[in-house]
């Protein structure tokens, strides 16, 4: 459980969202993402790896969360990261990379959008709200991260006393006052980039002639280890559930800068940034496009017991 980033157990057990069990005196957990294990690897092999260290990985991860259309408790995740550089060109390149991946999958530029924001935006927001409690900040971040899936009215309940879903499960809220919630709502309506890191990334996008992005302060990303620019990829076409009903699908990928995560596993100053895509989630959405087809190929093994039949 010591390699799951945000979910480092600082109480009696890891936080919700992780499949965990106790083995004598310590907690063991299924891999929640591919980023935190990378940070642990970098910390243990810091002197041996080149800087910046670039890597990509495919791997299975598990989420102890309520499943839904395109949302699974076990799924395949693609991850790409830059480790050991503060240069924001790395962040911009990862946004372009995720764009190229989607277009290789058959999507057109009109089918998706890369949204960018910065964790510095929420840092200023918490200062304005005069909120310092890490637990309360964590609840607020998770609530804001659900806006694209639940909508503002339902996310607002999570900012206040809490929310009961259709199954009757109740999620405790952040207990914010009405005026605090209003401050957040107004801040999310601001569409002008107001942080230096976002402005610099936009300049790099322009030099790449990359236009498939927009600034969106509602992009939060629920994980606490993000420290700077954050990005998210949303689809622009309708996605339906198994009953054929249109749904708010949310993002199919995203990421951001996590300059302090490696230091959780060693006394190192090692900036990093990365992106990830939920492949099962992406395929669920792609299968609903009328013009999308998966080219399925598979090996065929033929056992021959008579050498004289080889030519046949």
Task: State the predicted function of each range.
Residues 113-117, 301-304:
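Short internal beta-strands
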Residues 3-4, 23-25, 34-47, 55-108, ...:
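Positively charged, Gly/Ser-enriched RNA/tRNA-binding surfaces
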